[in-house]
Amino acid sequence: MGFKCGFVGLPNVGKSTLFNYLTKLNIPADNYPFCTIKSNVGIVPVLDNRLNKIAQVVCSNKIIPATIELVDIAGLVKGAYKGEGLGNQFLDHIRDTNVIMHIVRCFENRYVTHIYGSVDPVRDVQIINLELILSDIEVCKNRMCKLEINKLSHNKQVNKELLILKKCVYHLEKSKSLRSLNLTEEEIFVINYLRLITLKPVVYIFNISIDQSRNLYKREIFDIIKNEHNAKTVNVCLDLMQSSKNDVSAYDHLSLKYKQLFNKMLKNVIWAGFNALNLITFFTAGKKEVHAWTTTNNLFIFQSVKCIHTDLSKGFIRAQVISYDDFIKYKGEKRSKELGKIRIEGKRYVICDGDIIHVLYNV
């Protein structure tokens, strides 16, 4: 089960630099707009201290963490929805992601250029959000035109979708994202195939300076995003690396204090994306390996184990389940079983974060 986080923002705000440090890649991240043209993709581990503790209990030397896919998408500009700055191509890349990581520059630095000549985080957020909204309006209206042709057939499904799309367009034309529209699960299911961008969860990543006096960290930004449904925010400080042309080797020259600070920021970015997607982690554990698996919260166990192998989902019979806390407290399966802490669950069991499972199946 793959989950994609797309880095979105104006050109030259730090997307590629952040991508490099998270993925340990060295894609170009130079100080000029549209340095990135094609989207870059990298897989990053979701660091979880529970893995090491489980491995100690089962005496396993092999640990496999959960992962998230990151996509570094070229910068958007005004008019992107009409194709400005290769906008259509970039917007399609955003549609293919599961969560938007919106990077905003919030600091002054005369050595780092800005595509609009000045640093204004509020304006920059509004530019990107408006382009995404206009793109969704265009997608909805194009679909509505096609549906209108079939409207006379009195097809209930066609009329149902038309009503939902009209509701969406009305909301979008008030410059509001679809995240802030209270669509039902059924309504979302009907239009999900359109991959509407403003319906996706969002994380705002504020690229700040280590020198707080240079930060334009305006309260107005939060006034803009406060109505975003469950929008997450996180700070990063990428100007720590500017002196070395964004090469990942710049990290080696940081002091221990700044290394710890930078590592914490990177970890916060990954977990912000993880939480925005409403994901949880469950585990399989044995001497051969300890493996973390990622699934959407509130799924039945037979649905969740599909990420391990489709056969486990198709032929699911039952699962042996123990919570992480009990597994660690009682030092493994044997003592946990003696104390009645291991449960046998059927396919309608809703898997919980931290569950350690063993599945019985037959195909």
Curated annotation (Swiss-Prot):
- Which keywords are on file for this protein? ATP-binding, Magnesium, Metal-binding, Nucleotide-binding
Q: Where would I find the OBG-type G domain in this sequence?
A: 3-257
Query: What domain of life?
Result: Bacteria
Q: Which Pfam families match?
A: MMR_HSR1 (PF01926), YchF-GTPase_C (PF06071)
Question: What would you give as a GO molecular function for this chain, any one?
Answer: metal ion binding
Positions contributing to ATP binding: N12, V13, G14, K15, S16, T17
| SUPFAM superfamilies in the record | P-loop containing nucleoside triphosphate hydrolases, TGS-like
The residues that hold Mg(2+) are S16, T36
Q: Tell me yes or no: is Plastid among this UniProt entry's keywords.
A: no
GO CC terms in record:
cytoplasm
Per UniProt, residues of the TGS domain are 278-361
Q: Which cofactor does it need?
A: Mg(2+)
Presence of the UniProt keyword ATP-binding in the record: yes
> Which InterPro entries does this chain map to?
ATPase_YchF/OLA1 (IPR004396), Beta-grasp_dom_sf (IPR012675), G_OBG (IPR031167), GTP-bd (IPR006073), P-loop_NTPase (IPR027417), TGS (IPR004095), TGS-like (IPR012676), TGS-like_dom_sf (IPR023192)
Provide the family line. Belongs to the TRAFAC class OBG-HflX-like GTPase superfamily. OBG GTPase family. YchF/OLA1 subfamily.
- What does this chain do? ATPase that binds to both the 70S ribosome and the 50S ribosomal subunit in a nucleotide-independent manner.
Q: What is this protein called?
A: Ribosome-binding ATPase YchF
> Can you name the source organism?
Buchnera aphidicola subsp. Baizongia pistaciae (strain Bp)
Gene for this chain: ychF
